Every structure is written in structure tokens, then in C-alpha cells.
Regions:
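Buried hydrophobic positions in well-ordered alpha/beta secondary-structure cores of metabolic enzymes
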Residues: 24, 72, 90, 105, ...
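Conserved small/polar residues in nucleotide/adenosyl-binding loops
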Residues: 281-287
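PLP-dependent aminotransferase-class I/II
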Residues: 117-169
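Conserved PLP-anchoring active-site segment centered on the Schiff-base-forming lysine
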Residues: 97-115, 134
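Conserved N-terminal alpha-helix of the aminotransferase class I/II PLP-enzyme fold
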Residues: 35, 40-92, 114-122
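Active-site core of PLP-dependent enzymes with the aminotransferase class I/II
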Residues: 157-180, 189-193
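N-terminal glycine-rich, Lys/His-bearing helix-loop that initiates the first secondary-structure elements
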Residues: 1-55
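Active-site PLP-lysine loop of aminotransferase-like
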Residues: 204-217, 225-246, 273-278
Length: 288
């Protein structure tokens, strides 16, 4: 069901789930399964070969989590979403999906302390350089950019400074150079929709306002479907535009965007490589 034009309250309550067709239940069920039945070997081959999209294994997808992913995508105006185990996982994955050892990203220096430490130390151990800049001047992102820059990163309302990040200005600079802006929107879900201002990817810690009551830890990554990875090219974005040995040599933008006709090559790459192999897996949440 399309939710374009619906009230946010309606989207928050109903996106991604109507009712169980067999029982009529309006509550989202918890699918406690690891595996899924394929119709036949051809169906399995089609799923694994990225000819069609569907459930393969709960490490990378689950119908319960799918409701959360669809609901948040609808609220944010995203093409697709991916639930992961925590907000820190979402931040790390969002970068690792495009940057490799020897690459760099440009990040706002106004960050939550856990993210700052992750970027400064953990990503450094993986060979990914993070260049921190003062976000009050968008031009600082462009000044720090070189031919190895793969992404820009910032928080909408950084913890703890709460100084609003200039999403539109930095996103425009990024697109000029073929660089996506990734925005951690944990502090302002629904109130701010970064995709409306040009961001390519958003991340969330669902533990905060989305959960709302301190009982559930989780994270989300949303793909706006609005970034032209093919136009960015193989020199700027090799992770999406060159053969990926992690999944049989597939070229993600070519296969997902052009062959499958889906606008979320970034997210499908993340789901079928990082989530499958490294697996800070998403959770089957007890409540949506």
C-alpha cells in the first residue's frame, strides 16, 4: 500500500503491515525462524542470483524486521531500509559499505562520543581514514576531499552540541564530486527528513526516540534511492561500480539499478555482503 500523502500518524501505525491474511490479526507476528522454504531449485537460484528479491535466511532478512524497515522507510521517504543490532552498527556499516582500506571519509567533528571513537580508532584499524572537519562551514567538506574520499558523514542534531547540520549545502557539494552524504538522524526522526534535503543515506539508533522507552536496542540504515552511483563512476565509488568478489563478482549498480530496476543498490549490497558475512545481525524485535 502506498502511503504518499498520508498523515505521519497513519504511516507510523500501518506502514509495512496491514493484517494477517489467514487469521485477520492486526498485530505484527514474531517470525521465530532461521530459514525459509523455496518453491523449487529455480526459485532458490533466482533469489541467490539477485534475479528477484525475497527471504533467504534470517541473518540477512526476517518478515518481522521487514515491517520496521518498511515503516521507517515510509516515514523518512526512503526507497528501502535495513534493521541492524545497534546504532553503532548502523554507523559502521554505512561507511564500510562504500569505503575500503586506503580510502577516507569526511566527517563532521560534532558527533556522539561513541561514533567519534569508532571513526577515529576502529575505522582506522581497518585502514579507513576519517577526516574530521568543522561543520559550521560546509566548504570545509570540499576542502578536505581528495580522490580517495568515498562519503561525507554528519548528525542532524549532534550529540551533545545540538547545532543544526547544513544538510542541503553539504549534500550539494557531495553530489558535485560523486560523494554521498550519510546523515545520522537519531535525534530528529520524522521531524527532519534528510532525503528531502539531498542526503543519500540515513542511519538511526532505534534505542532513542524510535523505541522511546529504553527497552529495545537496535539500529537502522535507510537508502534514499536518490544517489546516482553509476554517474559517480568506478573511480569515485568502486564499491558499487566494480566487480565484488564477496558476491560472485556482481557489479552492484549495474545489477540492482539497471537489471533489477530497484533504486537501492547501496542497501542491497550492504544486506547481502556485510550483513551476511560480518553479521552484526538485525534483531527480531518484540514490538514495532
Amino acid at each position: 500500500m502506498a502511503y504518499e500523502g498520508k498523515n505521519l500518524e497513519t504511516i507510523a501505525l500501518h506502514a509495512g503491515w496491514r493484517n494477517d491474511e489467514t487469521t485477520g490479526s492486526v498485530a505484527v507476528p514474531i517470525h521465530q525462524t532461521t530459514s525459509y522454504q523455496f518453491n523449487d531449485t529455480a526459485h532458490a537460484a533466482s533469489l541467490f542470483g539477485l534475479q528477484e528479491f525475497g527471504n533467504i535466511y534470517t541473518r540477512i532478512m526476517n518478515p518481522t524486521c521487514d515491517v520496521l524497515e518498511q515503516r521507517m522507510a515510509a516515514l523518512d521517504g526512503a526507497a528501502a531500509g535495513l534493521a541492524v543490532s545497534s546504532g553503532q552498527t548502523a554507523s559502521a556499516y554505512s561507511i564500510q559499505n562504500v569505503a575500503r582500506a586506503g580510502d577516507n571519509i569526511i566527517s563532521s567533528s560534532h558527533l556522539y562520543g561513541g561514533t567519534y571513537n569508532q571513526f577515529k580508532n576502529n575505522l582506522k584499524e581497518m585502514g579507513i581514514e576519517v577526516r574530521f572537519v568543522d561543520p559550521t562551514d560546509p566548504a570545509n567538506f570540499e576542502k578536505a576531499t581528495n580522490d580517495k574520499t568515498r562519503a561525507y558523514f554528519a548528525e542532524t542534531l549532534p550529540n551533545p552540541k545540538l547545532q543544526v547540520f547544513p544538510i542541503g549545502e553539504v549534500a550539494e557539494i557531495g553530489r558535485k564530486h560523486g560523494i554521498p552524504l550519510i546523515v545520522d538522524n537519531t535525534a530528529a526522526p520524522v521531524l527532519c527528513r534528510p532525503f528531502d534535503h539531498g542526503a543519500a543515506v540515513t542511519t538511526y539508533s532505534t534505542t532513542k526516540y524510535i523505541g522511546g522507552h529504553g527497552t529495545t536496542i537496535g539500529g537502522l540504515i535507510l537508502d534514499g534511492g536518490n544517489f546516482d552511483w553509476g554517474k559517480a563512476g568506478a573511480d569515485r565509488q568502486p564499491a558499487l561500480n566494480t566487480p565484488d568478489p564477496c558476491y560472485g563478482g556482481v557489479v552492484w549498480d549495474e545489477q540492482v539499478t539497471k537489471n533489477m530496476g530497484l533504486p537501492f543498490a547501496y542497501l542491497l549490497k550492504l544486506r547481502t555482503t556485510l550483513l551476511r558475512a560480518v553479521s552484526y545481525t538485525h534483531l527480531t524485535l518484540p514490538t514495532i
